[in-house]
Structure formats: structure tokens, C-alpha cells
Amino acid sequence: MSPRVGRVERTTKETSVLVEINLDGTGKVDVATGVGFYDHMLDQLGRHGLFDLTVKTEGDLHIDTHHTIEDTALALGAAFKQALGDKVGIYRFGNCTVPLDESLAQVTVDLSGRPYLVHTEPENMAPMIGTYDTTMTRHIFESFVAQAQIALHIHVPYGRNAHHIVECQFKALARALRYASEHDPRAAGILPSTKGAL
């Protein structure tokens, strides 16, 4: 079986983004967005999902980080969808709960072909982690879901440290996506849908 790879290049007046993802990789990551904490989160996604992930983004960081973060997430979602292909033989559903010290993230995904996000995290988080605006976390997932066309539920019932709260979400997402996108040996050649389409 050939590796499932997606590659997307997205260029606007605000950003230039290249994303390549191999769903059947070993967690090799090469990421550079110009936003240090975001790079750290994308590294978690690749390593814990065992996806080979390349991300190269040049954006209008002289304004702020919004366009860079958003457009990278859009391209990542599109590349993930491309890599999934016809979805024949995959598990389709995946979930994972990940602690990071005092914080906990619960993530469930359905590779359904229908974009939907439910996202909750503790209120009154620190507004910034380095140059990363913590209000962008939800927007990253919104952008990713819109292009990947998946249903994604993320719940962080508790946590104090903003870094930990965000990081455990990316780690749990990585594992949930890995489990959902892996091939089920009992369902070879079968599309996991009663309606015959995903």
C-alpha cells in the first residue's frame, strides 16, 4: 500500500504556505511558521500522530500572527483531507484523553466529510504565550476542520497553565487523528459508512 500523502501550497497577499503530510509516517517533523509556540504545537501534532509533517509559512508577521496561524491551519486541513483519499478501510472514529500536569484534554474525531467543531477550554486563560495569541487556538481548529471536513470535539475540563492547556489539546488531537485515519485490518476494502459515502 502506497503512503497516503497530501501536499498543499496556498499563496495570498498575506501569506505563502506549503504543507505536506504523510499519514503513514513515523513522526518526522520539519516546521517553520515564524511563530515559535505554534511551531511547537505543530511538532506535537506530527510526532504524536506519527505523521511526517512539513510546514513552511512566510506571513505578514509585521502586522500580527493571525494570518500566518490561520492560513497554515487551512492548508493543513486541506492537506490532511487530500492524504485521507477515499477513506476506504479506515477506522473513521478516534478519541484520546491526554493529561499535561494539571491540564486535561479530551478529543474525539469523526472523519465524516462534514465539518463541525465543538471546543471548550477554561476561561480566563493568559492571553499570550510568547507571540502566540491564545484566542487563536479555537480558530486553528475551526480552520482545520473547515478544510479537512471532519467533526471535531475538544473539551478541556480543567487546567491552569495556558501552555499546558493548549499543548494537551494538540497532543490529544494528534492521537485521535492517528487512530481515526489508521486502517482497520477487519475492514479492508470497506468504506466505514452505512450510506456508502464519506
UniProtKB/Swiss-Prot annotation:
Protein localization: Cytoplasm
UniProt GO BP: L-histidine biosynthetic process
Example of a GO cellular component annotation carried by this entry: cytoplasm
GO function terms (MF aspect): imidazoleglycerol-phosphate dehydratase activity
Pfam families: IGPD
Enzyme Commission (EC) number: 4.2.1.19
Pathway involvement of the protein, from the record: Amino-acid biosynthesis; L-histidine biosynthesis; L-histidine from 5-phospho-alpha-D-ribose 1-diphosphate: step 6/9
Main location: cytoplasm
Major enzyme class: lyase
Cross-referenced CDD domains: IGPD
Keyword entries, A-Z: Amino-acid biosynthesis, Cytoplasm, Histidine biosynthesis, Lyase
Coiled coil region boundaries: none
Catalytic activity: D-erythro-1-(imidazol-4-yl)glycerol 3-phosphate = 3-(imidazol-4-yl)-2-oxopropyl phosphate + H2O
Gene3D superfamilies: Imidazole glycerol phosphate dehydratase, domain 1
PANTHER family: IMIDAZOLEGLYCEROL-PHOSPHATE DEHYDRATASE, IMIDAZOLEGLYCEROL-PHOSPHATE DEHYDRATASE HIS7
Family recorded in the similarity comment: Belongs to the imidazoleglycerol-phosphate dehydratase family.
Name listed for the protein in its UniProt record: Imidazoleglycerol-phosphate dehydratase
